[in-house]
Protein backbone atom coordinates (compact mmCIF):
# COMPACT_ATOMS: atom_id res chain seq x y z
CA UNK A 1 0.00 0.00 0.00
CA UNK A 2 1.33 3.43 -0.90
CA UNK A 3 2.23 5.61 2.03
CA UNK A 4 0.66 9.04 2.31
CA UNK A 5 2.70 11.95 1.01
CA UNK A 6 2.50 15.66 1.79
CA UNK A 7 3.50 18.46 -0.50
CA UNK A 8 2.99 22.12 -1.17
CA UNK A 9 4.35 25.49 -2.12
CA UNK A 10 6.08 27.99 0.12
CA UNK A 11 6.85 31.57 -0.88
CA UNK A 12 9.77 33.38 0.71
CA UNK A 13 9.18 37.12 0.56
CA UNK A 14 10.79 40.23 1.99
CA UNK A 15 12.59 43.36 0.94
CA UNK A 16 16.08 43.08 -0.57
CA UNK A 17 19.07 42.05 1.51
CA UNK A 18 17.21 40.68 4.53
CA UNK A 19 18.65 37.21 3.95
CA UNK A 20 16.04 35.41 1.83
CA UNK A 21 18.57 33.63 -0.35
CA UNK A 22 20.73 32.67 2.60
CA UNK A 23 17.74 31.25 4.39
CA UNK A 24 16.53 29.36 1.34
CA UNK A 25 19.95 27.86 0.67
CA UNK A 26 20.24 26.69 4.24
CA UNK A 27 16.71 25.29 4.25
CA UNK A 28 17.53 23.32 1.14
CA UNK A 29 20.89 22.16 2.40
CA UNK A 30 23.20 20.10 0.30
CA UNK A 31 20.64 17.67 -0.96
CA UNK A 32 18.93 19.95 -3.34
CA UNK A 33 19.97 21.37 -6.63
CA UNK A 34 18.68 24.80 -7.47
CA UNK A 35 16.55 24.57 -10.54
CA UNK A 36 16.29 28.25 -11.29
CA UNK A 37 16.58 28.61 -15.04
CA UNK A 38 14.06 25.96 -15.98
CA UNK A 39 10.53 26.02 -14.78
CA UNK A 40 9.72 29.67 -14.95
CA UNK A 41 6.31 31.04 -15.20
CA UNK A 42 5.37 34.65 -15.13
CA UNK A 43 3.58 34.24 -11.85
CA UNK A 44 6.00 32.08 -9.97
CA UNK A 45 9.58 31.18 -10.18
CA UNK A 46 10.75 27.97 -8.62
CA UNK A 47 13.74 28.41 -6.39
CA UNK A 48 14.25 24.96 -5.02
CA UNK A 49 12.74 21.69 -3.99
CA UNK A 50 13.06 20.17 -0.57
CA UNK A 51 12.14 16.53 -0.13
CA UNK A 52 12.38 14.88 3.27
CA UNK A 53 10.85 11.50 3.77
CA UNK A 54 7.27 11.70 2.65
CA UNK A 55 7.14 15.49 2.61
CA UNK A 56 8.04 17.89 -0.14
CA UNK A 57 8.19 21.67 -0.33
CA UNK A 58 8.51 23.57 -3.57
CA UNK A 59 9.91 27.02 -2.77
CA UNK A 60 8.70 29.76 -5.05
CA UNK A 61 9.59 33.31 -5.70
CA UNK A 62 6.94 35.91 -6.13
CA UNK A 63 7.94 38.46 -8.71
CA UNK A 64 6.49 41.74 -7.60
CA UNK A 65 7.24 41.26 -3.95
CA UNK A 66 10.90 40.87 -4.60
CA UNK A 67 11.38 44.57 -5.03
CA UNK A 68 8.42 46.06 -3.23
CA UNK A 69 9.33 49.58 -4.31
CA UNK A 70 8.77 48.62 -7.92
CA UNK A 71 5.44 47.14 -6.98
CA UNK A 72 4.25 50.36 -5.38
CA UNK A 73 2.54 51.69 -8.51
CA UNK A 74 0.74 48.46 -9.20
CA UNK A 75 0.24 47.61 -5.62
CA UNK A 76 -3.09 46.01 -6.11
CA UNK A 77 -1.58 43.89 -8.83
CA UNK A 78 -3.77 40.88 -9.04
CA UNK A 79 -0.92 38.69 -10.13
CA UNK A 80 0.95 39.10 -6.90
CA UNK A 81 -2.08 38.09 -4.94
CA UNK A 82 -2.84 35.16 -7.18
CA UNK A 83 0.72 33.94 -7.00
CA UNK A 84 0.58 34.14 -3.23
CA UNK A 85 -2.92 32.84 -2.81
CA UNK A 86 -2.15 29.34 -3.94
CA UNK A 87 0.89 28.75 -1.78
CA UNK A 88 0.56 26.72 1.39
CA UNK A 89 2.66 29.03 3.52
CA UNK A 90 4.43 32.35 3.29
CA UNK A 91 7.76 33.06 4.94
CA UNK A 92 8.20 36.79 5.38
CA UNK A 93 11.81 37.60 6.17
CA UNK A 94 12.84 40.81 7.95
CA UNK A 95 16.16 42.11 9.25
CA UNK A 96 16.26 42.31 13.05
CA UNK A 97 19.27 44.62 13.03
CA UNK A 98 17.03 47.50 12.01
CA UNK A 99 13.49 48.68 12.62
CA UNK A 100 10.97 48.38 9.77
CA UNK A 101 11.25 50.69 6.78
CA UNK A 102 8.53 51.71 4.31
CA UNK A 103 9.59 48.78 2.18
CA UNK A 104 8.70 46.37 4.95
CA UNK A 105 5.36 48.13 5.32
CA UNK A 106 4.68 47.50 1.64
CA UNK A 107 5.38 43.82 2.05
CA UNK A 108 3.08 43.70 5.05
CA UNK A 109 0.32 45.38 3.07
CA UNK A 110 0.73 42.96 0.22
CA UNK A 111 0.41 40.06 2.63
CA UNK A 112 -2.65 41.40 4.42
CA UNK A 113 -5.23 39.89 2.05
CA UNK A 114 -3.77 36.47 2.76
CA UNK A 115 -4.47 36.59 6.46
CA UNK A 116 -6.71 33.71 7.41
CA UNK A 117 -6.10 31.97 4.10
CA UNK A 118 -2.44 31.01 4.30
CA UNK A 119 -0.15 30.68 7.32
CA UNK A 120 2.27 33.60 7.37
CA UNK A 121 5.50 33.07 9.25
CA UNK A 122 7.27 36.29 10.17
CA UNK A 123 10.94 35.42 10.36
CA UNK A 124 13.12 37.98 12.11
CA UNK A 125 16.51 37.18 10.65
CA UNK A 126 20.12 38.08 11.58
CA UNK A 127 19.42 37.48 15.26
CA UNK A 128 23.16 36.86 15.72
CA UNK A 129 23.98 40.40 14.67
CA UNK A 130 21.05 42.33 16.12
CA UNK A 131 21.49 44.67 19.08
CA UNK A 132 17.83 45.08 20.00
CA UNK A 133 16.12 42.10 18.40
CA UNK A 134 13.07 42.07 20.70
CA UNK A 135 12.22 45.69 19.98
CA UNK A 136 12.71 45.26 16.26
CA UNK A 137 10.62 42.10 16.22
CA UNK A 138 7.80 43.83 18.05
CA UNK A 139 7.77 46.65 15.50
CA UNK A 140 7.69 44.22 12.59
CA UNK A 141 4.97 42.16 14.18
CA UNK A 142 2.81 45.25 14.59
CA UNK A 143 2.79 45.64 10.81
CA UNK A 144 0.99 42.32 10.54
CA UNK A 145 -0.18 41.09 13.94
CA UNK A 146 -1.70 37.94 12.40
CA UNK A 147 1.69 36.67 11.29
CA UNK A 148 3.41 34.12 13.45
CA UNK A 149 6.69 35.62 14.67
CA UNK A 150 10.00 33.92 15.30
CA UNK A 151 13.58 35.07 15.51
CA UNK A 152 16.55 33.26 14.07
CA UNK A 153 19.75 33.53 12.18
CA UNK A 154 19.72 32.05 8.71
CA UNK A 155 23.31 31.04 9.45
CA UNK A 156 22.34 28.94 12.48
CA UNK A 157 21.87 25.34 11.46
CA UNK A 158 19.71 24.34 14.38
CA UNK A 159 17.37 27.31 14.12
CA UNK A 160 16.97 26.76 10.40
CA UNK A 161 16.25 23.08 10.99
CA UNK A 162 13.44 24.03 13.37
CA UNK A 163 11.88 26.32 10.80
CA UNK A 164 12.24 23.61 8.19
CA UNK A 165 10.45 21.07 10.38
CA UNK A 166 7.60 23.51 10.98
CA UNK A 167 7.24 24.25 7.28
CA UNK A 168 7.28 20.59 6.34
CA UNK A 169 4.56 19.98 8.91
CA UNK A 170 2.35 22.62 7.27
CA UNK A 171 2.23 20.84 3.93
CA UNK A 172 -1.12 19.26 3.10
CA UNK A 173 -1.56 15.70 1.98
CA UNK A 174 -0.95 15.24 -1.72
CA UNK A 175 1.36 13.73 -4.30
CA UNK A 176 4.87 15.05 -4.83
CA UNK A 177 5.24 17.68 -7.52
CA UNK A 178 8.67 16.40 -8.40
CA UNK A 179 10.03 12.88 -8.43
CA UNK A 180 11.46 12.02 -5.06
CA UNK A 181 15.01 11.67 -6.30
CA UNK A 182 14.83 14.55 -8.73
CA UNK A 183 16.43 17.15 -6.55
CA UNK A 184 18.90 14.79 -4.99
CA UNK A 185 20.22 13.32 -8.16
CA UNK A 186 22.96 14.87 -10.17
CA UNK A 187 20.97 14.37 -13.31
CA UNK A 188 20.89 17.26 -15.67
CA UNK A 189 17.54 18.59 -16.71
CA UNK A 190 18.02 17.04 -20.15
CA UNK A 191 18.73 13.62 -18.66
CA UNK A 192 15.65 13.90 -16.51
CA UNK A 193 13.47 14.75 -19.52
CA UNK A 194 15.05 11.93 -21.54
CA UNK A 195 14.09 9.45 -18.81
CA UNK A 196 10.48 10.60 -18.84
CA UNK A 197 10.39 10.23 -22.61
CA UNK A 198 11.88 6.75 -22.38
CA UNK A 199 9.33 5.76 -19.75
CA UNK A 200 6.42 6.91 -21.92
CA UNK A 201 7.87 5.17 -24.98
CA UNK A 202 8.41 1.88 -23.14
CA UNK A 203 4.84 1.88 -21.88
CA UNK A 204 3.59 1.96 -25.46
CA UNK A 205 5.90 -0.55 -27.13
CA UNK A 206 5.92 -4.34 -27.05
CA UNK A 207 8.19 -7.31 -27.65
CA UNK A 208 11.84 -6.50 -27.92
CA UNK A 209 11.33 -2.94 -29.06
CA UNK A 210 11.26 -1.20 -25.65
CA UNK A 211 14.77 -2.33 -24.84
CA UNK A 212 16.07 -1.08 -28.14
CA UNK A 213 14.91 2.43 -27.30
CA UNK A 214 17.28 5.09 -26.03
CA UNK A 215 16.46 8.72 -25.61
CA UNK A 216 18.44 11.89 -25.69
CA UNK A 217 17.59 15.54 -25.26
CA UNK A 218 19.50 17.73 -27.67
CA UNK A 219 18.18 21.14 -26.86
CA UNK A 220 16.18 22.94 -24.21
CA UNK A 221 15.24 26.52 -24.77
CA UNK A 222 12.99 28.93 -22.97
CA UNK A 223 10.88 30.67 -25.59
CA UNK A 224 9.75 34.25 -25.25
CA UNK A 225 6.11 33.22 -25.09
CA UNK A 226 6.91 31.21 -21.95
CA UNK A 227 6.89 27.86 -23.72
CA UNK A 228 9.72 25.47 -22.98
CA UNK A 229 11.07 24.11 -26.25
CA UNK A 230 12.61 20.64 -26.05
CA UNK A 231 14.29 18.81 -28.90
CA UNK A 232 14.58 15.10 -28.22
CA UNK A 233 15.70 12.05 -30.15
CA UNK A 234 14.35 8.57 -29.73
CA UNK A 235 16.92 6.05 -30.91
CA UNK A 236 16.26 2.48 -31.99
CA UNK A 237 18.63 -0.13 -33.31
CA UNK A 238 17.04 -1.12 -36.62
CA UNK A 239 14.86 0.43 -39.34
CA UNK A 240 12.13 -2.13 -38.61
CA UNK A 241 11.96 -0.83 -35.04
CA UNK A 242 11.82 2.71 -36.28
CA UNK A 243 8.70 1.84 -38.27
CA UNK A 244 7.11 0.35 -35.15
CA UNK A 245 7.94 3.36 -33.01
CA UNK A 246 6.55 5.75 -35.58
CA UNK A 247 3.47 3.62 -36.09
CA UNK A 248 0.81 3.75 -38.74
CA UNK A 249 0.44 7.27 -40.02
CA UNK A 250 2.79 8.42 -37.24
CA UNK A 251 0.21 7.56 -34.63
CA UNK A 252 2.49 5.81 -32.15
CA UNK A 253 5.15 8.49 -31.99
CA UNK A 254 2.45 11.12 -31.66
CA UNK A 255 1.00 9.26 -28.70
CA UNK A 256 4.43 8.96 -27.06
CA UNK A 257 5.14 12.63 -27.64
CA UNK A 258 1.81 13.76 -26.25
CA UNK A 259 2.10 11.65 -23.11
CA UNK A 260 5.62 12.93 -22.49
CA UNK A 261 4.58 16.51 -23.04
CA UNK A 262 1.63 16.14 -20.68
CA UNK A 263 3.75 14.62 -17.95
CA UNK A 264 6.38 17.34 -18.30
CA UNK A 265 3.79 20.08 -18.26
CA UNK A 266 2.23 18.67 -15.12
CA UNK A 267 5.60 18.39 -13.38
CA UNK A 268 6.97 21.72 -14.50
CA UNK A 269 3.77 23.74 -14.40
CA UNK A 270 4.36 25.25 -17.80
CA UNK A 271 3.71 24.74 -21.49
CA UNK A 272 6.11 22.46 -23.30
CA UNK A 273 6.77 22.13 -27.01
CA UNK A 274 8.33 18.75 -27.67
CA UNK A 275 10.16 18.32 -30.95
CA UNK A 276 10.57 14.59 -31.26
CA UNK A 277 12.53 12.64 -33.86
CA UNK A 278 13.13 8.91 -34.31
CA UNK A 279 16.56 7.82 -35.51
CA UNK A 280 18.31 4.53 -36.09
CA UNK A 281 21.54 4.04 -34.20
CA UNK A 282 22.64 0.57 -35.35
CA UNK A 283 23.29 -1.77 -32.42
CA UNK A 284 23.77 1.05 -29.96
CA UNK A 285 23.46 -1.37 -27.07
CA UNK A 286 26.68 -3.10 -28.10
CA UNK A 287 28.61 0.05 -28.82
CA UNK A 288 30.51 1.50 -25.83
CA UNK A 289 30.79 4.86 -27.47
CA UNK A 290 27.08 4.95 -28.17
CA UNK A 291 26.35 3.99 -24.58
CA UNK A 292 28.47 6.83 -23.32
CA UNK A 293 26.88 9.24 -25.73
CA UNK A 294 23.42 8.21 -24.64
CA UNK A 295 24.24 8.71 -21.01
CA UNK A 296 24.84 5.13 -19.90
CA UNK A 297 28.10 6.14 -18.40
CA UNK A 298 29.34 3.04 -16.68
CA UNK A 299 26.97 0.30 -17.69
CA UNK A 300 28.86 -1.23 -20.58
CA UNK A 301 28.71 -4.97 -20.46
N1 LIG B 1 24.87 38.15 10.38
C1 LIG B 1 24.00 37.60 9.56
N2 LIG B 1 24.04 37.88 8.25
C2 LIG B 1 23.14 37.30 7.43
C3 LIG B 1 22.17 36.41 7.91
N3 LIG B 1 21.41 36.01 6.87
C4 LIG B 1 21.89 36.62 5.79
N4 LIG B 1 22.93 37.41 6.10
C5 LIG B 1 23.71 38.27 5.20
O1 LIG B 1 22.87 39.27 4.66
C6 LIG B 1 23.25 39.60 3.32
C7 LIG B 1 22.04 39.48 2.40
O2 LIG B 1 21.66 38.13 2.35
P1 LIG B 1 20.85 37.53 1.11
O3 LIG B 1 20.54 36.16 1.47
O4 LIG B 1 21.57 37.79 -0.15
O5 LIG B 1 19.56 38.45 1.14
P2 LIG B 1 18.31 38.47 0.17
O6 LIG B 1 17.16 38.87 0.98
O7 LIG B 1 18.22 37.21 -0.57
O8 LIG B 1 18.70 39.64 -0.79
P3 LIG B 1 18.07 39.99 -2.25
O9 LIG B 1 18.50 38.87 -3.14
O10 LIG B 1 18.74 41.30 -2.56
O11 LIG B 1 16.61 40.12 -2.09
C8 LIG B 1 24.37 38.65 2.97
O12 LIG B 1 25.58 39.33 3.15
C9 LIG B 1 24.23 37.53 4.00
O13 LIG B 1 25.45 36.91 4.28
C10 LIG B 1 22.14 36.13 9.32
O14 LIG B 1 21.34 35.36 9.85
N5 LIG B 1 23.09 36.75 10.09
Curated annotation (Swiss-Prot):
UniProt-annotated stretches for the region G3: 61-64
Residue ranges constituting the KH type-2 domain according to the UniProt record: 205-282
Top-rank taxon: Bacteria
Keyword line: Cell inner membrane, Cell membrane, Cytoplasm, GTP-binding, Membrane, Nucleotide-binding, Ribosome biogenesis, RNA-binding, rRNA-binding
Region described as G2: spans on this chain: 40-44
Residue numbers spanned by region G5: 152-154
Sequence ranges assigned to domain Era-type G in this UniProt record: 6-173
SUPFAM superfamilies in the record: P-loop containing nucleoside triphosphate hydrolases, Prokaryotic type KH domain (KH-domain type II)
Region (G4) residue spans: 125-128
InterPro entries: G_ERA_dom, GTP-bd, GTPase_Era-like, KH_dom-like_a/b, KH_dom_type_2, KH_sf_prok-type, P-loop_NTPase, Small_GTP-bd
UniProt-recorded Gene Ontology molecular function terms: GTP binding; GTPase activity; ribosomal small subunit binding; small ribosomal subunit rRNA binding
GO biological process: ribosomal small subunit assembly
Residues that, per the record, bind GTP: 14-21, 61-65, 125-128
Function (record text): An essential GTPase that binds both GDP and GTP, with rapid nucleotide exchange. Plays a role in 16S rRNA processing and 30S ribosomal subunit biogenesis and possibly also in cell cycle regulation and energy metabolism. The Era binding site on the 30S subunit overlaps that of protein S1 and is in direct contact with 5 nucleotides directly upstream of the anti-Shine-Dalgarno sequence; the presence of Era may prevent mRNA recruitment. 30S subunits bound to Era are not able to bind to the 50S subunit to make functional ribosomes. Era may serve a role in the final stages of 30S ribosomal subunit assembly.
Homology family: Belongs to the TRAFAC class TrmE-Era-EngA-EngB-Septin-like GTPase superfamily. Era GTPase family.
Name of the protein this chain belongs to: GTPase Era
Annotated source species: Thermus thermophilus (strain ATCC 27634 / DSM 579 / HB8)
